[in-house]
Amino acid sequence: MQFSTTPTLEGQTIVEYCGVVTGEAILGANIFRDFFAGIRDIVGGRSGAYEKELRKAREIAFEELGDQARALGADAVVGIDIDYETVGQNGSMLMVSVSGTAVKTRR
């Protein structure tokens, strides 16, 4: 499965548009990680805990996106948009959503 934020794939022809596909992931943030991440942010360091959670959520969302595209018989998803949001009380959860158009291609 190929993923692209562009509307086309170089060197390939889109032969069929299969439909819009989406993938979402919502992960809760651990209160102790939040506390220590806040301290690192204050002293100017990077928050490895948050970066790891973002990466994990993005991987889950893309896996779901690919599963939906495969179910439609597609071999690629183009025009992908990635959004990040904090949700829940006091932004206690992280949501990653991805969407795009599932397509069949030919070289």
From Swiss-Prot:
Disulfide bonds: none annotated. It comes from the Bacteria. Pfam families: YbjQ_1 (PF01906). InterPro entries: UPF0145_dom_sf, UPF0145_YbjQ-like. SUPFAM superfamilies: YbjQ-like. Belongs to the UPF0145 family. NCBIfam families: PRK02877.1. HAMAP family: UPF0145. This is UPF0145 protein YbjQ. It comes from Escherichia coli (strain SMS-3-5 / SECEC). The lineage of its organism: Bacteria, Pseudomonadati, Pseudomonadota, Gammaproteobacteria, Enterobacterales. The gene is ybjQ.
